[in-house]
Amino acid sequence: RTVFCHDPLLRGAIRLNLLTDRVDIVRDLGWRRNTSALTDTDVKYLLLYFEQNYGLTSEKKMTAALSIVANENCYHPIQDVLNGLVWDGTPRIRSCLHHFLGAEVSDYVEEMLKHFLLGAIRRVFFPGSKYEEMLCLVGGQGAGKSSFFRLLAIRDEWFSDDLKKLDDDRVYLKLQGHWIIEMSEMLATSSAKSIEEIRSFISRQKETYRTPYEAQPKDRLRQCVFGGSSNTLDFLPLDRAGNRRFLPIMIYPENAEVHILEDEDASRAYLLQVWAEAMTVYRSGHYSMKFSKSIQRQLVEVQKDFMPEDTEAGQIQGFLEHYTGSMVCSKQLFKEALGHTYDEPKRWQLHNINEIMNTVVTGWKPFSNPRMFAGYGRQKGWERDVSGNELPGNEDEFVELSEEECRQLELPKEWIA
């Protein structure tokens, strides 16, 4: 340890990289090296140096001292870069995606990108901090979506697009040492077993595993965020409860001011200023990682544009637009709206109808106390919402009930003495 701390050549050269969780040699020590990370060859050179200059030959003691000194002299390369940025005062976050990819300039696009940038910054300064969303760029091939994420990572080694499967036992190796990870063309998403698996993976805050060189497993707090890209519009899974993990932005490369690879140095300089602006927001503390209600509503509507067509929801909504009754139940919708006249619904089919009525259909509200439905018995269901603009006519006017509604309101004969 004394040699590592006081030797003129070695002093300050051995540092623990908090991003990669590996020991780095951060300056030239006199032999050829291809990477900053400590290798077996480096250990052999160091052992030779110790033997020739100090007569020390114990590799075990040297490597133990090396680990201690590295841990005492740790650093985080991304933190160092971000802390060194100085913003020139020109706002770029709002127009960044338009500049490179032709996305519209709007509050929605600005908030999505700013949210992603702040999530990435927080993950670096507070590893494992909660960030459950994935920025998704949607548009034609060759627009520069992957290049945008790569250059946004500042250094190429801090970017990865090698995540192909979410259920890989060694997925942690794909994350370690990277800051921005692109799920290229959503391959990782589309091969996942379920929507819940995708949500669980994105929202995870740590990985727990043991490397071959460690005796005990260790929690690795996540320092990365995820970006997605797709050439197809319906890349989101059909999830009526919401795809809140995904933040889609449509790009129009023909509207871009410049292709991101046209002048890579200029693009990198531009993106450094984007990070500098984001760091200014981060340092101010005047931000929230929760979207405003207005942005949340926009996000839900935008997400619908990127989901497969929901045919059953359309059938039910169309049926209700011409339905004259004031109440419906799920069994009634199964038979009358979806056309299963002679079939009995399975539990999952009723659950599907409930989800549609509670999350997609407008103009109806649920009631929890079972009511009588002609031909369907006592059922929970939905009643027409006549509040606000949904009110049919003046609320003080008498509304005549249809024959079907009268039948629904009748008491069961067994209740009448």
Q: What are these model-derived regions, one by one?
A:
Residues 281-325:
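Conserved alpha/beta core segments of nucleic-acid transaction machinery
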Residues 330-342:
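DNA-recognition alpha helix
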Residues 238-256:
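A short helix-turn-beta junction within AAA+ P-loop NTPase domains corresponding to the substrate/partner-engaging
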Residues 1-92, 107-111, 343-344, 348, ...:
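N-terminal nucleic-acid engagement/recognition segments and initiation subdomains in replication
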Residues 66-176, 180, 338:
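P-loop NTPase catalytic core of nucleic-acid-dependent motor ATPases
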Residues 195-218:
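Conserved catalytic/switch belt of AAA+ P-loop NTPases
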